[in-house]
Regions:
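FNR/FR-type flavoprotein reductase catalytic core
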Residues: 1-118
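C-terminal hydrophobic helical "lid"/dimerization subdomain
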Residues: 155, 160-161
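Local cysteine-cluster metal-coordination motifs and their immediate loop/turn environment
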Residues: 23-25, 94-95, 116-152
């Protein structure tokens, strides 16, 4: 598999967006990136790791129940706080990633998504983890990308969510 292309963040302003179980992977990215970054974290109700993120970036929180930060989702937090970025790195549930893809297209922001999927074999043979892609996959000869082998990180415009 692959990771986020850190070189794409050089000299740019970056959103690190995590939702639910997609939050922990973004913490390591916050540690590694040496650029201007803002972590936008989406929770159902209970916060975790936000204190750790504060060591490496500005942090904005959204909770579904409004118990902390912005009431709503990560895009609500971005809009409410007037945040801007050149690049998005995101990991979280598919509905969040779908919304971020649309937001990035609308605002012409480079967007990289780490897709969450069960991976049966982990080597691309079983095709249990495929997502629909814009291009024809050279392995399966259909519009698929194997998340375990070709991903899990994709440029948003390469995949259909």
């Amino acid at each position: 598999g692959n990771g986020f292309p850190l070189e794409r963040a050089a000299g740019k302003k970056v959103f690190l967006i995590g939702g639910g179980i997609g939050i922990p992977p973004m913490l390591e990215l916050a540690r590694q990136l040496d650029c201007e970054k803002q972590a936008v974290l989406g929770y159902r109700d209970v916060l975790f790791l936000n204190d750790e993120f504060e060591k490496f970036s500005d942090v904005y929180v959204a909770t579904e129940d409004g118990s902390a930060g912005t009431k709503g989702n990560v895009l609500d937090a971005i809009r409410e706080n007037g945040l801007k970025a050149d690049v998005i790195f995101a990991c979280g549930p598919t509905p969040m990633l779908r919304a971020l893809k649309a937001y990035a297209e609308e605002h012409e922001i480079e967007c990289w998504l780490s897709l969450e999927e069960k991976m049966a074999c982990g080597i691309g043979a079983c095709l249990a983890c495929v997502c629909q892609s814009k291009e024809v996959d050279e392995h399966s000869h259909v519009h698929n990308k194997r998340i375990c082998k070709d991903g899990p990180v994709f440029l948003a415009q390469e995949v259909e969510l």
